[in-house]
Structures are given as structure tokens and as C-alpha cells.
A protein has these predicted regions:
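Conserved hydrolase catalytic core segment
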Residues: 311-354
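Alpha/beta-hydrolase
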Residues: 366-461, 468
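Short beta-strand/loop motif that positions the catalytic acidic residue
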Residues: 466, 472-474, 478
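Conserved alpha/beta-hydrolase
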Residues: 260-279
Length: 529
């Protein structure tokens, strides 16, 4: 929820109030007699709803028009409701102004003068992700629509009963429609409520620090960055996500909030993906990322963070593919780096080395247990015949049976859905990313040279010493980047200070399983570094 003037809310209120002011002198004959019979409970709901909806429409800037997205359709439907509402009034003012004229259906919509604005403001709440408006519209609807349904029945009388078979069919159809609406809007209300609660909590939690989203001009385009910390004087950690092309910045706060009391975390959607991708696409920048451009953009971002927070150096934290970017960067620019935290270090993806490594271990375990290895060998052969990201997925699924994680995820899908940072572009990119599993090659193409470069990466051939302290964190059940390979590499390198922390029972993303343990280990290492 973002406080600020809403011109959309003002327009909606004008469309609501103007015809009502005109109506005050053009009420249906005998209307006041019906008012005396209004249910006091429904009237109370109506007044409370009006009290909530009217100011809320004006003071939340989220209702204003953003860029064109899925949510724009929700705003459009809301506007259409208000337009039909105006047509309703025109029809009424041109009629004889009887109770029946006032309560005549429009386009099959019952009590349109009451239901249309309620639906419009409810949808405005969905569009703006604002639970205050949503609840206000629901309360208003209970009272306002309830009152006017009673008036309509008084004006028109009860409808004659339809035949039993017709009533049954219509009843079933209504039940199905109502159930669908409850499920769909129930989901949105749940997500928006959780999101709003988290937004308010974090506004208070970080009021003395920073909780900001922005686009930073980098060497090769704009980069989306989220800055989170409780004191802007704290050292800075730049987080490099995995992939390539797999940002999850909307969820990283769940993993790294434990660092924000001592560090400011900069979470970046790397060049060519996520919000950074959509921002540059909108500006006509269709440049595909390359290993060189990634490093240039990291350097630009590091310089921005150093300048903004008055720091000589920053900590680089990388996960999975981010450890490739981080290893390269700290080797090229040690003068700008305090330390390197590597989570799930990529040692060698050359010729998919880690996948072969994981397969051999799974095959050995399967044979030792006397399991049928036919399917395992089949998917491995398919992978070897055409090694790529798509054919890798069935292989990982088959080998995972023998590489079970014993530590559960610390977060649920509900936590992700209720993230205060989840945006439309995050959902768009995630769907685009997962379309790869269905054989869509567009995602791979969007990553330019990065995937090909990763497939030729072997850190043993590049870096045997570092000029900055380095810490390697791996899950003991990580077979995407096997911890034993990381340990062998760790033991072979030289650095001013080095440490390795194996998280027992965790997989490739230990920060999602034991975030508190991981953050404590990181803090301890950085203090000693």
C-alpha cells in the first residue's frame, strides 16, 4: 500500500456522487416511505462501508494507472462498471422516475444502481492490491445492495416461481459460479491481505533504515535493485542470484532478513532477466547479456552502492550461477570487495560435469540397494545424447530419489504469494522461465551467451587464489553443485582467510531451509574477516 493522491479514485467518486446529487431532487415517487422500512443492520453496514471506501479511494496511489499489465484488465472492468452505472442513471432520469424504473435490471444486472459501483470499487481494490478498499467494498455491498434488493422486491413484488427442473438447473449454475468467484477472489483477497500486512510491518521495521526499490543506470542498461537494511551506515552486501536468469528477489527477504540488522542488502535482478529485462525492453534496449556485459554491470552496480552508502568496499554474496559471477568479479576487482560469500558454488559445469557426478553417485546407490536402474539409465542416456537444460530436468528428477534432503523448507508457497515485493513482472518472468520445461526455447535464447559460457565453466582452470576472504556454504544434500566438489576446490585454493560451512541435510538452496543458521555463520565469518 502506497500513500498518495489517487486521481483514479477521484474520478470514480465523481462518477458516483454527481448522479446521486442530481437524484436527490429526482427520487422515485414514494421512495421515502420505503426508506422508513430499511433494515438497521444493513444500514449500519452501508454507512461503515461508505466511511471506508470514500477516503481510501483518494489516499492510496496504487489505484493510479501503472504500465499495461494483466491488472490493467481489472481496472478496465472496474471502469466499465462505472460507465454502465452512468448509463443506468441516464436511463432513469429519462424515465417517469417510478420505483420500478429505478429498480429495473440493466443488461441482466440486478439493482444496477447499487451493485455496479460496489463491484467497481471492489475491483479497484484488487487492482491496487489494497485490502482496506476490498473490505470496505464488501461491507458497503452487504449493506447497500441488501437494502436495495429489499426495495426492489417491494417495488416489483416477488417473482413467480419457476418450474422445479428449471430451479434446480439454475441453482446448480449459480452455485458453480459463486464457488468459482469465491475461490478466485478469495485467493486474491488472501494474497493482498498478507501482502498489505507485510508491507505495513516492514514499513515500521525499516523506518530508520532503507526499504527501497529502484532502477539503477548500469553500463549496459537499467538494473532493478531492492535495498533493505535497518541502518544505512552499515556495510553493504550485493546478492547475485542463480540461473542464469533465475531471479527471486521478491523472496530473498525471507532468506536474508537476518543480515539486515548489521548489513544493507542489495538484491539485483541481473541483466537480461526479471524486472531488469522488462524495464530495458520497454525502453527499446534488446541487448542480450554476455559474460562481459554481466561483469560490466556488476562493476557499475558496485560503484553505485559504494558511492551511495559511502563505502570503500562491498561484500559479494553469490548463489549457484551467482557464484560464477562473484568468483570472476572478486578476482578482477579485489580492491572493491570486502569478502566473498559463496552459496552452492559452481565448480564445474563443463560438459555438465556435476550432472554426471550426481548420476554416478545415484547409480551406485541404486545398485547397492538392488533397485531397478532401467529408468535411471534411460534418462541419463537421453541426456547424454542431447545434453541441455531441458533434458537435464528428467535426469535430476531421477537422481533426486537417492539424494533426499532431510531439512524441510523454512518457507511455504503462502509466504511467496504474500510477499510484499511480489510484482507482475516477477510472475511474468517466472512463467517465462518455467515455459522452458515445456520445450519453449525462448528463455534460453533470452540469456544470450550466458548458458553456453556456463557449460564451459570450470573454476579449477581459472582461479586458485584470491586476494579477499572467501567463505563457501553448501548443503550436504546438494547434488546440483555437489558439496564434495566444492570441498576439494576449497582445500586447493589460497586466500587471506577462507572457511567452509556444510549444512547437514540441506540441498542446493540452504538459505531457504535454515536461514537463521546460514545468516549467523555469515555474520561470524565477516566479523573475523
Amino acid at each position: 500500500m502506497k500513500l498518495g493522491f489517487s486521481y483514479i479514485g477521484l474520478i470514480w467518486l465523481i462518477m458516483l456522487f454527481v448522479p446521486n446529487f442530481i437524484w436527490m431532487k429526482n427520487k422515485p415517487k414514494g421512495y421515502e416511505e420505503h426508506v422508513k422500512k430499511e433494515n438497521k443492520v444493513l444500514l449500519a453496514f452501508e454507512r461503515v462501508g461508505q466511511f471506508i471506501v470514500t477516503p481510501a479511494a483518494l489516499i492510496f496511489a496504487n489505484f493510479n494507472i501503472h504500465k499495461i499489465t494483466f491488472w490493467s484488465a481489472v481496472l478496465l472492468i472496474s471502469f466499465i462498471c462505472m460507465v454502465i452505472y452512468e448509463i443506468f442513471w441516464i436511463r432513469y432520469f429519462r424515465s417517469e422516475k417510478t420505483m420500478k424504473d429505478f429498480y429495473r435490471n440493466m443488461f441482466g444486472i440486478a439493482v444496477p444502481g447499487a451493485s455496479l459501483p460496489v463491484v467497481a470499487f471492489f475491483l479497484l481494490g484488487i487492482y491496487g492490491g489494497n485490502i482496506i478498499m476490498i473490505l470496505g467494498a464488501i461491507i458497503l455491498g452487504i449493506g447497500h445492495i441488501g437494502i436495495h434488493i429489499a426495495h426492489r422486491n417491494e417495488a416489483w413484488g416477488k417473482k413467480p416461481k419457476k418450474k422445479l427442473p428449471v430451479r434446480i438447473i439454475l441453482g446448480i449454475l449459480k452455485a458453480v459460479v459463486i464457488l468459482l468467484l469465491v475461490v478466485v477472489f478469495g485467493f486474491f483477497i488472501y494474497a493482498i491481505t498478507g501482502r498489505n500486512i507485510n508491507e505495513v510491518k516492514r514499513a515500521f521495521e525499516f523506518k530508520e533504515g532503507i526499504n527501497e526499490e529502484l532502477y539503477v543506470p548500469l553500463k549496459n542498461g537499467d538494473g532493478f535493485v531492492r535495498l533493505i537494511g535497518k541502518d544505512q551506515n552499515n556495510p553493504v552486501i550485493l546478492s547475485l542470484h542463480g540461473g542464469p536468469g533465475e531471479p527471486a528477489g521478491y523472496a530473498e527477504y525471507l532468506c536474508f532478513d537476518g543480515l539486515t540488522d548489521e548489513y544493507t542488502i542489495a538484491i539485483w535482478d541481473e541483466s537480461g532477466c526479471g524486472r531488469s529485462y522488462y524495464r530495458n525492453k520497454e525502453k527499446g534496449n534488446t541487448m542480450l547479456p554476455t559474460p562481459q556485459s554481466q561483469q560490466e554491470d556488476i562493476d557499475s552496480l558496485v560503484d553505485y552502492l559504494r558511492g551511495r552508502f559511502n563505502q570503500d568496499k562491498v561484500v559479494i554474496l553469490g548463489h549457484s550461477y551467482g557464484t560464477v559471477l562473484g568468483s570472476i568479479y572478486i578476482s578482477a576487482h579485489p580492491e572493491k570487495v570486502t569478502a566473498f560469500i559463496s552459496i552452492g558454488q559452481v565448480v564445474s559445469f563443463k560438459n555438465f560435469a556435476s550432472e554426471h557426478y550426481a548420476y554416478e553417485d545415484a547409480l551406485a546407490q541404486a545398485k547397492a540397494k538392488g533397485d531397478d536402474t532401467t529408468e535411471l539409465e534411460k534418462v541419463y542416456k537421453a541426456f547424454c545424447d542431447d545434453p541441455n537444460v531441458v533434458s537435464m530436468q528428467p535426469l535430476r528428477q531421477a537422481t533426486s530419489r537417492y539424494h533426499q534432503e532431510t531439512v524441510p523448507q523454512a518457507f511455504t508457497y503462502a509466504d511467496l504469494v504474500c510477499s510484499p515485493y511480489l510484482g507482475v513482472d516477477d510472475v511474468r518472468w517466472t512463467l517465462f522461465e518455467y515455459s522452458m520445461m515445456l520445450g519453449n526455447t525462448a528463455f534460453e535464447a533470452s540469456q544470450g551467451e550466458l548458458l553456453a559460457d556456463l557449460m564451459g565453466f570450470d573454476i579449477n582452470e581459472r582461479y586458485k587464489s584470491y586476494e579477499v576472504p572467501v567463505m563457501y556454504i553448501s548443503g550436504s544434500a546438494d547434488w546440483t553443485c555437489p558439496w564434495t566438489m566444492v570441498k576439494e576446490y576449497y582445500e586447493s585454493i589460497e586466500a587471506p582467510k577462507k572457511a567452509m560451512y556444510v549444512m547437514e541435510g540441506c540441498g542446493h538452496v540452504p538459505q531457504n531451509q535454515l536461514p537463521d543458521d546460514l545468516n549467523s555463520a555469515v555474520k561470524q565469518f565477516l566479523k573475523s574477516a
